Design a protein with these regions (language model features):
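Short acidic/glycine-enriched loop/turn segments that link adjacent beta-strands
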Residues: 40-44
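Glyoxalase I/VOC metalloenzyme domain signal
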Residues: 1-8, 15-35, 49-90
Length: 90
């Protein structure tokens, strides 16, 4: 079985301090900071944008209902979300 990856949708990084982290990425790497509403009454999220790429910045103490995440998240860990034309059945 092979899945055709078309691109990277986004990356999520877990951090202990969202404000400090986005300040660093913005100041040092020139990334644009955006805050967006994920909908469904969830807490607003902060992301870093550069070109067509996005990094979501997740606080380590985020509610698991607000952020779907691994059972053992830690500062410095991350997750990748890919874009694909493959279906779940494939």
């Amino acid at each position: 079985m092979s899945v055709k990856v078309n691109g990277l949708d986004h990356l999520v990084i877990n951090v202990t301090d969202v404000v400090r982290s986005v300040a660093w990425y913005s100041r040092i790497l020139g990334m644009e900071v955006k805050v967006f509403d994920p909908g469904k009454g969830k807490t607003p999220r902060t992301s870093l944008v550069f070109g067509n790429q996005k990094i979501n910045v997740r606080p380590c103490d985020a509610d698991k209902v607000d952020w779907f995440t691994a059972d053992h998240e830690a500062a410095g860990s991350d997750d990748l979300c890919f874009l694909t034309s493959s279906t779940p059945d494939e």
